[in-house]
Amino acid sequence: KEGYLVNHSTGCKYECYKLGDNDYCLRECKQQYGKGAGGYCYAFGCWCTHLYEQAVVWPLPKKTCN
């Protein structure tokens, strides 16, 4: 599974500005989804890869980004 890293309290994607390989996104994806996860910056949001099937990613149901 893959998807955008989401802030559970705001419903917003984690923003990033350095597209492609991005240490911030990689670190945040691993912190939220485990050390097997990967991450990079895609379309100014942190995109996480190698997630478990039940991983919660953006968009959150009934939670829009405020």
From Swiss-Prot:
Instruction: Give the chief site where it resides.
Output: secreted
Recorded GO molecular functions are: sodium channel inhibitor activity; toxin activity
What do the Gene Ontology cellular component annotations say? extracellular region
Organs and tissues of expression: Expressed by the venom gland.
Q: Which residue pairs form cystines in this protein? A: 12-65, 16-41, 25-46, 29-48
Keyword field: Amidation, Disulfide bond, Ion channel impairing toxin, Neurotoxin, Secreted, Toxin, Voltage-gated sodium channel impairing toxin
The UniProt similarity line reads: Belongs to the long (4 C-C) scorpion toxin superfamily. Sodium channel inhibitor family. Beta subfamily.
Further remark, if any?
Answer: Negative results: does not modify the currents of the human voltage-gated sodium channels Nav1.1/SCN1A, Nav1.2/SCN2A, Nav1.3/SCN3A, Nav1.4/SCN4A, Nav1.5/SCN5A and Nav1.7/SCN9A.
Name of this chain's protein:
Beta-toxin Cbo1
